[in-house]
């Protein structure tokens, strides 16, 4: 259903019993959507992901179907999701390229919520937890996005940073420790921000070509950019 940041969702026993990292929601009580979002982003709360999934779609399975449909709309062609938390399952998978597309979509489509990813800590029920993203604690322009870890996949991270109005999204995965994840992601972000530049190929409202028109009033029509074309 439609939710707002102020909406309150009931915590099911399934969510409360969920293993792994937790936000520590309490079974039978309600939690605010904004708190749950922060619990997922900052605290890596597997329990919070299930509360949100059930609130949005009724069940976690139904949410996974919605998730797969949405993933396809943003070009994630080699991913399949069967749960909300990323809990290990042979049918739950993605690729570095797809995860980079997800990161870019988060930044582009939901700028009003992206600031949550830069929060270094969050307190819920008097329990304060630090953000696990190591990039946030290094002065290299990072402002997100999300860590991940399972025994099968190793330590991973979708990271992002901005410098001189130029944004970089990076993905690392399969690293053998949190320390290795921190070092490799930091190295990649610093390198990318120093060694790549944005180039403007066409300014907004520029005529870039003429297209032939068949049986029209004019023989050609101008192709004009709506916005700056950069890469």
Residue ranges and their predicted role:
Residues 76-80, 88-93, 97-231:
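Domain-terminus/edge residues, biased toward the C-terminal soluble/receptor-binding domains
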Residues 1-97, 104-108:
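Active-site-adjacent loops and short helices of periplasmic peptidoglycan-processing enzymes
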């Amino acid at each position: 259903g439609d939710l707002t940041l102020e909406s309150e969702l009931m915590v099911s026993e399934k969510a409360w019993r969920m293993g792994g990292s937790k936000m520590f929601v309490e079974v039978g009580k309600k939690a605010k959507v904004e708190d749950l979002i922060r619990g997922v982003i900052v605290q890596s709360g597997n329990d919070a992901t299930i509360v949100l999934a059930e609130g949005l779609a009724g069940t976690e399975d139904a949410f996974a179907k919605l998730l797969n449909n949405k993933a396809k709309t943003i070009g994630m062609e080699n991913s399949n999701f069967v749960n909300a938390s990323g809990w290990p399952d042979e049918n739950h998978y993605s690729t570095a390229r797809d995860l980079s597309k997800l990161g870019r979509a988060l930044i582009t489509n939901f700028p009003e919520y992206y600031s949550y990813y830069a929060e270094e800590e969050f307190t819920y029920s008097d329990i304060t937890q630090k953000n696990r993203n190591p990039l946030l604690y290094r002065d290299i322009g990072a402002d997100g996005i999300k860590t991940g870890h399972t025994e099968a996949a190793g330590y991973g991270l979708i990271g992002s940073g901005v410098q001189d109005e130029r944004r970089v999204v990076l993905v690392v995965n399969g690293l053998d420790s949190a320390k290795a994840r921190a070092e490799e992601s930091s190295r990649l972000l610093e390198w990318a921000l120093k060694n790549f530049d944005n180039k403007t190929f066409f300014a907004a409202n520029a005529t870039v070509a003429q297209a032939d028109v068949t049986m029209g009033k004019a023989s050609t029509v101008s192709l004009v950019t709506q916005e700056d074309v950069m890469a």
